[in-house]
């Protein structure tokens, strides 16, 4: 399983209920749908231009004003656990990290192994758009798209055997989700055989 956002909850729950330990490109980002599509259409290039980044007032996120993507677990923090005003000094390291994750994303998608992409808060029109974008990028890839929503959003209208409808209640205030409904949904869809293989304490979130 590979997270396509919308936020950290997806990556966190994938780790809790599988053997996955390594990071993927979108794992610890907040990614609005339009930002996700823009990132994919750009082949994950040019998303960290210095003149497009700004520090949010609460100093918890660096935001991209062009894509709307928010980086909360990427830039180093100071002793007060804030992202410092001089966050751009850390940009070379952050770019190196995302260059690596970009290469990993494409290498995995070009392998013979099937992939299930997982996206939270996505309607049927968006699901179809995302499926078509992934197919255009990786025409030989055997993939599924698991769409996670708290209620019925008409995903059946997309009429695609690739799209999996997962109904999972909205997460708690910590943004990491409720493990029990995730375990039930992932197991029921055949996406994991190892629910609760890790505890919350086992999962390392960078700069959390």
Residue ranges and their predicted role:
Residues 1-208:
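Extracellular glycan-modifying ectodomains
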């Amino acid at each position: 399983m590979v997270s396509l956002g919308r936020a950290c909850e997806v990556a966190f729950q994938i780790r809790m209920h599988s053997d996955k330990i390594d990071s993927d490109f979108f794992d610890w980002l907040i990614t609005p749908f339009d930002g996700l599509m823009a990132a994919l259409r750009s082949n994950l290039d040019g998303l960290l231009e210095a003149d497009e980044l700004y520090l949010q007032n609460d100093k918890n996120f660096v935001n991209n004003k062009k894509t709307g993507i928010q980086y909360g677990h990427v830039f180093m923090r100071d002793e007060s656990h804030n992202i410092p005003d001089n966050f751009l000094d850390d940009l070379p390291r952050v770019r190196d990290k995302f260059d690596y994750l970009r290469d990993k994303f494409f290498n995995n998608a070009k392998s013979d192994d099937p992939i299930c992409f997982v996206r939270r808060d996505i309607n049927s029109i968006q699901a179809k758009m995302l499926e078509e974008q992934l197919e255009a990028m990786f025409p030989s890839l055997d993939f599924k798209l698991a769409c996670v929503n708290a209620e019925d959003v008409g995903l059946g209208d997309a009429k695609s055997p690739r799209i999996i409808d997962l109904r999972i209640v909205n997460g708690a205030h910590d943004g990491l989700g409720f493990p029990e409904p995730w375990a039930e949904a992932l197991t029921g869809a055949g996406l994991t055989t190892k629910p609760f293989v890790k505890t919350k304490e086992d999962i390392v979130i960078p700069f959390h």
